[in-house]
């Protein structure tokens, strides 16, 4: 397949028939349907991606590095690319899934922009970070074991320049059981409205609940501040999905 040929995009039917339960993995089968899966599963995703371009344009610094950690197929990476006006910036996408990186390479090649993109098939917990003005963790931290999240965010905070930012998008949980029930029900209705059956919703939930560990907004705010960020604000929320902007002042 030529790098100028778009990868085949399929409708997500991975959980449409009964299957033995196993943990969710970002393998080749998921990579093939990922654009459809995330659009139909994550409310607000199609708003968050173009706003990452806007945020990048506001906070990117000349000669700095920009990172998309857990880049999957590169939607955030390309949004950042189009928000960077400086040709001396370095843009890096990192993902530990070979299937995702392989497909991401095609999307990067098809994108009409001159800024080079470096893709690394690496663990974000150990990938090299430095001189960062904009970093994104777009629905990625939730898949990192909770006991390793502070260390990762501290590494990002240490690598971030004064005036730099982290965009952190996450599925969250709520302190109140009543609110949790309402937000979960609304999220499931969103997925039904996008064509998922009750079987698909329940089977995906069973597959993902052991690997996607959501936390409260208070948990995220506290950890980001401990990691070296001075301001943390929620710039977007739809049901139990949020995107935060963490700013390092000094």
Curated annotation (Swiss-Prot):
Its EC number is 2.1.3.-. The keyword Chloroplast does not apply. S-adenosyl-L-methionine binds at residues 45, 70-72, 95-96, 123-124, 138, 205. It catalyses: prephenate + S-adenosyl-L-methionine = carboxy-S-adenosyl-L-methionine + 3-phenylpyruvate + H2O. InterPro entries: CmoA, Methyltransf_25, SAM-dependent_MTases_sf. Gene3D superfamilies: Vaccinia Virus protein VP39. It is an enzyme of class 2 (transferase). Pfam families: Methyltransf_25. Keywords: S-adenosyl-L-methionine, Transferase. GO terms for biological process: tRNA wobble uridine modification. The keyword Transcription does not apply. GO terms for molecular function: carboxyl- or carbamoyltransferase activity; S-adenosyl-L-methionine binding. Belongs to the class I-like SAM-binding methyltransferase superfamily. Cx-SAM synthase family. Catalyzes the conversion of S-adenosyl-L-methionine (SAM) to carboxy-S-adenosyl-L-methionine (Cx-SAM). Homodimer. This is Carboxy-S-adenosyl-L-methionine synthase. It comes from Marinobacter nauticus (strain ATCC 700491 / DSM 11845 / VT8).
């Amino acid at each position: 397949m030529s790098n100028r040929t778009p990868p085949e995009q399929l409708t997500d039917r991975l959980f449409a028939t009964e299957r033995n339960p196993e943990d969710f993995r970002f393998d080749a089968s998921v990579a093939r349907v990922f654009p459809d899966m995330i659009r139909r599963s994550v409310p607000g995703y199609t708003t968050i991606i173009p706003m990452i371009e806007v945020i990048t344009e506001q906070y990117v610094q000349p000669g700095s590095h920009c990172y998309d950690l857990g880049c999957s197929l590169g939607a955030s990476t390309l949004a950042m690319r189009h928000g960077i006006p400086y040709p001396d910036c370095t843009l890096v996408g990192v993902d530990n899934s070979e299937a995702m990186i392989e497909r991401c390479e095609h999307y990067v090649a098809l994108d009409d922009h001159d800024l080079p993109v470096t893709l690394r098939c690496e663990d974000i917990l150990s990938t090299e970070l430095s001189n960062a003005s904009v970093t994104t963790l777009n629905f990625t931290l939730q898949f990192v074991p909770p006991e390793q999240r502070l260390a990762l965010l501290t590494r990002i905070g240490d690598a971030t320049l004064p005036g730099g930012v982290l965009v952190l998008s996450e599925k969250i949980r709520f302190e109140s059981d009543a609110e949790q029930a309402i937000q979960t029900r609304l999220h499931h209705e969103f997925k039904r409205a996008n064509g998922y059956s009750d079987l698909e919703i329940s089977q995906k939930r069973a597959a993902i609940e052991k690997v996607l560990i959501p936390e409260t907004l208070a948990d995220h705010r506290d950890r980001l501040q401990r990691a070296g960020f001075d301001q943390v604000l929620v710039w977007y929320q739809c049901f139990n999905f949020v995107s935060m902007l963490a700013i390092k002042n000094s």
